[in-house]
Amino acid sequence: MADDSGTENEGSGCTGWFMVEAIVQHPTGTQISDDEDEEVEDSGYDMVDFIDDSNITHNSLEAQALFNRQEADTHYATVQDLKRKYLGSPYVSPINTIAEAVESEISPRLDAIKLTRQPKKVKRRLFQTRELTDSGYGYSEVEAGTGTQVEKHGVPENGGDGQEKDTGRDIEGEEHTEAEAPTNSVREHAGTAGILELLKCKDLRAALLGKFKECFGLSFIDLIRPFKSDKTTCLDWVVAGFGIHHSISEAFQKLIEPLSLYAHIQWLTNAWGMVLLVLLRFKVNKSRSTVARTLATLLNIPENQMLIEPPKIQSGVAALYWFRTGISNASTVIGEAPEWITRQTVIEHGLADSQFKLTEMVQWAYDNDICEESEIAFEYAQRGDFDSNARAFLNSNMQAKYVKDCATMCRHYKHAEMRKMSIKQWIKHRGSKIEGTGNWKPIVQFLRHQNIEFIPFLTKFKLWLHGTPKKNCIAIVGPPDTGKSYFCMSLISFLGGTVISHVNSSSHFWLQPLVDAKVALLDDATQPCWIYMDTYMRNLLDGNPMSIDRKHKALTLIKCPPLLVTSNIDITKEDKYKYLHTRVTTFTFPNPFPFDRNGNAVYELSNTNWKCFFERLSSSLDIQDSEDEEDGSNSQAFRCVPGTVVRTL
């Protein structure tokens, strides 16, 4: 028998077979969880009271019903807040059904989804509008009273007898359906359809004008004067806005006050919401487009829902409307009323504007040295805001005649005043109209630049200034761009002289300006001009009286005023003009006129410098004031307006 395995040295210890039993907790490949204790035995006690099988009492049922109702209300309010946030129109409007109407037009498929059953009548409508029960705004009595039915029942023209019978049955069914529907819902649908139809109309302005007249009882055109261009600026504007949210009406006064000097605000309520009528005077002139953008931002409405025009400032009816409504409790007024309202509503102003006086207009033109008709008309019309006589002029139908008469009389007065003055008085008179002192040195420096001795020039200039016979004509000759015309034009500008041109020599009246001139200039005399002067003007250059032909007037006998001539031809070098050598004093300007790097003249020959020149050299030119005139002139200022006697008590 073979040896038993594992039995060596039998008898010395444990011998024989023994049984080993292993305990397997997890089979091979089993994943052991880290967060659970696998050794804990599940006794089943944690499943106790998992299901509540206790008796339900009456009080617990009421609490559960109350909790369910509160949860439902909370969910409903949350849904409504989301609807207001995401389904609202871009402009806040009290007409809340417009939002869903716009939504249905943008997405017809979304509008077709219905959770409630609609009546059969809806299928026959072309446009369907829904009611927003959660809008928060109710329909006013005006909307309920003016609501009209949207569709009219009728029989199709193309249908036969059978179709007519079916249509009749459908109409009868619809009538029963309408009887079941609430009356308020029909009115709301009708009002919404009318507003949508208005917004879709081609002439929105006409619809707004009609609604304005319906609300305020007068036409918008009666208060305004229309401007065609949106870029024309004006200080006063009349604005009518429609469909404004009621919350804006409370804050509009505070919003518009920093932008305006005067505001007349009226608010009314109609089926479209709040309607605004406001007369504004801004701090600066604004155009219609600027006013529209500003108020569209303040009122939160589109620009096409506003009527914006300037007020009718010459209408007494319009001024009376703003005045009467301003003192009533229907309006809010900010600031002082414009002068055009006060002028037409206060009795004293009305009496002062009743009669126009031409003498006041002539006196104004004389004082401001304005003799041109167009300038008189424009400048005097600008005074209509504060001058009662100018307002009467604007209200007259003979403005053209008044302007012509005023210009004629002003020229007569000016001409008589000029002829009455000597050259010394005239230079002083012209200098008194120029402000500033100036500097006489640039004139002397320019003469030296042209190689002209100042003392001989001053002697001959004195004889020319006083109109000495055969010495009352000075010719400045030389090459081009030497400053001849610049020198003579600056002198004529200071002395208030006139300019004649040989280009008009074909006319008999080209010498007519010499009649009304104290000094004169003939610029750029050419060869034909010198020939004409040598042929016809010798007696005139001698300083003797000469007859001048005037247009539409008789011949006038005048003495030629001091005459300046500029030319590129030196008559002293040509023998054919020998008869003019003794009648014309000639100075030559040989050097070009200098300019600096910036293109400015080096020698400034301005009116202020000429004023300083005559004041500085008055004794050399024999135009200084006498001892009797040093204290001022004794003559009074010219007045063509009759004086008034003040009667004291």
From Swiss-Prot:
There is a cross-link at K559 (Glycyl lysine isopeptide (Lys-Gly) (interchain with G-Cter in SUMO)). One of its GO terms (cellular component) is host cell nucleus. A motif (Nuclear localization signal) lies at residues 83-85. GO terms for molecular function: ATP binding; ATP hydrolysis activity; DNA binding; DNA helicase activity. Residues 452-602 form the SF3 helicase domain. The lineage of its organism: Viruses, Monodnaviria, Shotokuvirae, Cossaviricota, Papovaviricetes. This is Replication protein E1. It comes from Human papillomavirus type 6b. Belongs to the papillomaviridae E1 protein family.
